[in-house]
């Protein structure tokens, strides 16, 4: 039977790097990519977001105004709860469809790449959970550079999520994706050998 492996980490820990390494051997169900599809222009979920947050939640072409929404929800817990309430079920449904499709290949395992895996309860369907980690200083630096944020704005985004230490404590496997990519690759390959035939 195909195993479901959860992959998560804190913001800017380098989870996408690990996901790309895993994708060389196993199918990936990427919650972020699915969310972009579910929240695309004209989609029912996008319409519900606009109904709740107003027209400023979308750009002129109908795509979500993600910078505006991000600024809002990372500074307002109630707004984050409202957005999550609108998006959670449609994204979960689309993810289950993607899992069924990936399982048609009969892989050894399917990777569920879910940034908010514990927060959304996906760990309950996983056989194992991998958590990608990096030091707080590295995470802050990466987030500021990647998203062009001030230190204060980056820290607010980090603080809005479950603490990385809690995720690590709940992990079956921890992959350190600090400064050395070669060590990260070695850790991923070592873990893959335990899963793949």
Swiss-Prot record:
Entry binding sites for ATP: 12-17
Signal peptide stretch: none
Record localization: Cytoplasm
Pfam family, one: CoaE
Pathway: Cofactor biosynthesis; coenzyme A biosynthesis; CoA from (R)-pantothenate: step 5/5
Enzyme class, first EC level, given as a word: transferase
Reaction equations catalysed: 3'-dephospho-CoA + ATP = ADP + CoA + H(+)
GO molecular function, one term: ATP binding
Transmembrane domains' residue ranges: none
Catalytic activity, EC: 2.7.1.24
Keywords, alphabetical: ATP-binding, Coenzyme A biosynthesis, Cytoplasm, Kinase, Nucleotide-binding, Transferase
Location (main, coarse): cytoplasm
ATP-binding as UniProt keyword: yes
Domain DPCK: residue ranges: 4-197
Example of a GO biological process term: coenzyme A biosynthetic process
InterPro entries, A to Z: Depp_CoAkinase, P-loop_NTPase
A cellular component term, taken from the record's GO annotations: cytoplasm
Function per UniProt: Catalyzes the phosphorylation of the 3'-hydroxyl group of dephosphocoenzyme A to form coenzyme A.
HAMAP family named among the record's database cross-references: Dephospho_CoA_kinase
Membership in a protein family: Belongs to the CoaE family.
Name the record gives this protein: Dephospho-CoA kinase
Organism ancestry: Bacteria, Bacillati, Bacillota, Bacilli, Lactobacillales
């Amino acid at each position: 039977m195909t195993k479901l492996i959860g992959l998560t980490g804190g913001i800017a820990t380098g989870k996408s790097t690990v996901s790309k390494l895993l994708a060389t051997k196993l199918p990936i169900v990427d919650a972020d990519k699915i969310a972009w599809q579910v929240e695309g222009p004209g989609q029912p979920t996008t319409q519900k977001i606009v109904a709740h947050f107003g027209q400023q939640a979308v750009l002129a072409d109908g795509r979500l105004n993600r910078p505006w929404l991000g600024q809002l929800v990372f500074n307002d817990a109630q707004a984050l709860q409202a957005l999550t309430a609108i998006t959670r079920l449609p994204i979960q449904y689309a993810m289950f469809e993607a899992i069924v499709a990936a399982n048609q290949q009969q892989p050894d395992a399917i990777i569920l790449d879910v940034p908010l895996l514990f927060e959304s309860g996906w760990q309950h369907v996983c056989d194992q959970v991998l958590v990608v980690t990096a030091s707080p200083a590295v995470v802050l630096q990466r987030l500021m550079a990647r998203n062009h944020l001030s230190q204060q704005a980056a820290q607010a985004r980090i603080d809005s999520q479950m603490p990385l230490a809690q995720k690590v404590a709940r992990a079956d496997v921890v992959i350190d994706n600090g400064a050395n990519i070669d060590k990260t690759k070695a850790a991923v390959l070592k873990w893959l050998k335990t899963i793949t035939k």
